Amino acid sequence: MDTIVAKITNDSLTDKKIYEQAGKILREGGLVAFPTETVYGLGADALDEEASAKIYAAKGRPSDNPLIVHIADIEALYKLSCEVPDKALKLADKFWPGPLTMILKKSDIVPDSITGGLGTVAIRMPSHKVAAELIRTSGVYIAAPSANTSGKPSPTRASHVIKDLSGKIDMIIEDDTVDIGVESTIIDLSEEVPTILRPGYITKEMFEEVIGVVRIDPAITEGVKSGVVPKAPGMKYKHYAPDADLKIVEGDEAKVVEYINDNVNRLISQGYKVAVMTTEEGKHNYNKGIIVSMGHKDDELSAARHLYAVLREFDNENVDYVFSESFETDNVCLLYTSDAADDLIGV
């Protein structure tokens, strides 16, 4: 398969043709990768079972891993869900369009192929101009996981998508204006107590300011038990892992620095390629290996924006081991621990 790569130019006539071409591909059951404000998504018509099956095949993704349906207007909630609680509307009013995915009870039009056979559906309204225009132009709801080979770090640039999926999908829309760089937060509203199923840009505290008590599913850190179908992407299967062995080190700052330096020196002496993820304030503590700053210590958004691009770069550099300081904010720590890390080490 020859994959079309089309770059958004901000010329209205040229871009209109790109959206029309991509929309036609989606309506005919094809696959289109496109940018969102979080990461690049791999889209298909959500109500076309054969099209969604192509997503699983292209990514090498387990078919019991649910897909997120992307919509362009609030009315779609009532078509895709048979029960829209008040809390869902409050969250939509606060965070949509944006990096929020809500799990709701599904309506009869939603095929089991995108829900893992469950009675719930994951729904998101993206804010990125390309994603929003593609949904409107295509006239379909778009099921879209991240546009990467399953298990690889999520793509924040078109080049990442091309590397993973060129020749496997019909089209890639290029527009490298991904603002956030990490996945949407997924919250389950199908049960009595709202529950975060996947950490992301929106934090537990941000939710609780709008709808009250929210819990975090223990499966985020403990994993989903064998034989259980996950309610959301990322719960059962390890997502976004670099090829390198990634270790998060937390504890007293001096002990963390000592532990990382000792292990970096030891591994380099054994011939391994090693990297360190730190902060602007902590860079001076390390002088061996590939040293990468994730931003300032108190800026979780900077760390989040850099995360997947940095992991991709480590893959390109054939890094064997990565040591990361544990960031102060619970949200980013949770992202690292649940998505990418092989070990969380306390010192």
Ranges and model annotations:
Residues 1-338:
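Active-site-adjacent structural elements in enzyme catalytic cores
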Residues 336-347:
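Single conserved hydrophobic/aromatic residue that forms the stacking wall/gate
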